[in-house]
A protein has these predicted regions:
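Rossmann-like flavin
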Residues: 81-175
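C-terminal catalytic lobe of FAD-dependent flavoproteins
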Residues: 159, 255, 300-381, 424-425
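Extreme N-terminal leader/targeting segments of oxidoreductases
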Residues: 1-27, 45, 459, 467-473
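N-terminal pre-ligand scaffold of iron-sulfur
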Residues: 359-442, 468-476
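Active-site substrate-recognition segment that forms the wall
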Residues: 68, 104-111, 206-207, 214-330, ...
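Glycine-rich FAD pyrophosphate-binding loop
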Residues: 45-63
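Helical element adjacent to the flavin cofactor pocket in flavoenzyme catalytic cores
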Residues: 133-134, 155-211
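N-terminal Rossmann-like FAD-binding beta1-loop-alpha1 element of flavoenzymes
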Residues: 25-50
Length: 476
């Protein structure tokens, strides 16, 4: 069984250009995922530079399910008074993605299908009934299905679709490559504002810009929106299984716990993608238990064996609406997609680009990153996270072939691989100082506080940290 994303199967990409000199640009976008590339697409005629700390197509978007639908559990979660606005934003986002794919002939396994929202219990039925009212008052057609896979109740809409998100990103990158300056493996570590210019440090070089847009999923500096105090991170696992028939639907449960979609690859092979659980990150650090539960569920319910399994994390705001737009004058952020990165990332790109272009946008106020977002809930969550932070400082862990030890008042992590070779790293996340937990499933060092991930040699895989935890070997 592998722990790689299904979307990377048979993907070959060339090494991207790396920033190695000081440059000046009108608009600098940090983060070349769904939001960054879509924003660049809308602003491509305005002298845009986009940078990414790694390879494009290997960030958070690559570990999504690739469903594009507005029939979401988030329609009821937290955004009281904004349900209609959120629904319409997701419909517009779906249309944005569809238009980009079709008008640019992007080959990304685009397939029209329909979406189910299903109830697993009577309480879920009540939730769906409320969502029906939201759909009705916005003239959105849906159908009721009393028995969907043995569940209590479900509704479906027909104008949704699925894609291979990695191919979509790479298609966007190719489309933009002649109109936008793109740099990969180029890490932004800090920025300043002087003489009406943003000055961003990247790979020990500097980029001057009039506008700065941060679309890194989780902003790389705490000062960018104070996200650790306004949102939290959830983690879940996705299981990939062989499937014998291409089914033309995707589905989620009304409580948001279960997700199903099907994927037909270029060779005609059919897969089923399934996830059944996500929770706050610090509650999900026992990776082996989570994967075993997922394997048990797929075997018990679908009689299928998982061939590949991988995890993903996302930033959740307390009102379940993204923090996207202008944070300060000419400084923009986009984060907090609450599990729906393809649609929320795309509509965030439209909000930001409309603002820079001087256009009105009906979602600007609702998505405003400066709005109040559950301050009390944020304080409560941070008290819980503080407990995790303190316990991470106190405990010595031993997980399979990895353990944490202390030497000269410095904590280290050691992993011994199948060849009996030792891989030693610093056991402290450079972002905010949490100690790391070894993930036996993905063979990575994971941060339980804000989801930074490092490989066994300390190289950074995911942020918000922008520094590695590598221990430099002493020369003999």
């Amino acid at each position: 069984m592998t722990n790689k994303s299904i979307w990377h199967k048979n993907i070959r990409t060339k090494r991207g250009k790396e920033l190695k000199e000081d440059i000046e640009t009108n608009i600098l976008i940090i983060g070349a995922g769904i939001t960054g590339l879509t924003t660049a697409y809308f602003l491509k005629d305005k002298d845009v530079t986009i940078i990414d700390k790694g390879k494009i197509g290997y960030g958070k978007t690559a570990f999504s399910t690739g469903k594009v639908t507005y029939l979401q559990d988030l329609l009821l979660k937290g955004n009281k008074g904004n349900e209609d606005c959120y629904l319409l934003s997701q419909i517009e986002a779906s249309n944005i993605i569809k238009k980009i794919i079709l008008s640019n002939n992007i080959k990304c396994n685009y397939e029209s299908n329909f979406s189910y929202l299903f109830a697993e219990n009577e309480n879920d039925v009540k939730k769906i009934k409320k969502i029906e009212k939201i759909l009705n008052r916005n003239d959105i057609k849906f159908k009721v299905k009393e028995d969907f896979q043995g569940n209590h109740y479900s509704i479906k809409v027909e104008d949704t679709f699925v894609i291979n998100p990695v191919k979509y990103l790479l298609g966007l990158k190719e489309k933009l490559s002649k109109e936008v300056k793109i740099y990969e493996n180029s890490i932004a570590t800090d920025f300043d504002y002087k003489e009406n210019k943003f000055i961003t440090k990247v790979n020990n070089n500097y980029i001057k810009s009039n506008y700065l847009i941060v679309t890194t999923g989780y902003p790389f500096l705490v000062s960018l929106g104070l996200i650790p105090f306004r949102a939290y991170i959830e983690k879940g696992y996705i299981g990939v299984m062989d499937n014998d028939k291409n089914k033309k639907y995707n589905a989620i449960s009304a409580n948001g716990n279960e997700s199903i979609r099907f994927f037909l690859d270029d060779s005609g092979k059919e897969y089923m993608l399934y996830s059944n659980f996500s929770d706050k990150l610090y509650k999900c650090m026992n990776n082996e238990d989570m994967t075993e539960e997922l394997k048990w569920k797929t075997k018990a319910v679908y009689n299928k064996k998982i061939s590949s399994i991988y995890s993903n994390t996302d930033v959740y705001t307390f009102d379940k609406i993204p923090l996207s737009g202008e944070l300060y004058s000419n400084l923009y952020i986009a984060t907090g997609y609450s599990g729906w990165g393809l649609t929320n990332g795309s509509i965030s790109a439209k909000i930001i680009s409309d603002s820079i272009n001087g256009y009105q946008n009906q979602y600007k106020k609702t998505f405003n990153p400066n709005r109040k977002t559950g301050i009390f809930k944020g304080l409560l969550h941070n008290m819980e996270s503080l407990t995790v932070y303190l316990s991470s400082k106190l405990k010595k862990e031993e997980q399979g072939n990895a353990y944490v030890y202390e030497k000269d008042n410095i904590k280290y992590g050691k992993y011994i691989d199948s060849k009996n070779e030792e891989h030693i790293v610093y056991n402290k996340c450079p972002h905010m100082g949490c100690n790391l937990t070894f993930n036996n499933v993905s063979k990575t060092w994971d941060c339980p506080c804000h989801s930074s991930r490092f490989d066994i040699d300390g190289n950074i895989i995911f942020g918000p940290s922008h520094y590695s935890i590598k221990v430099e070997k002493k020369k003999e």
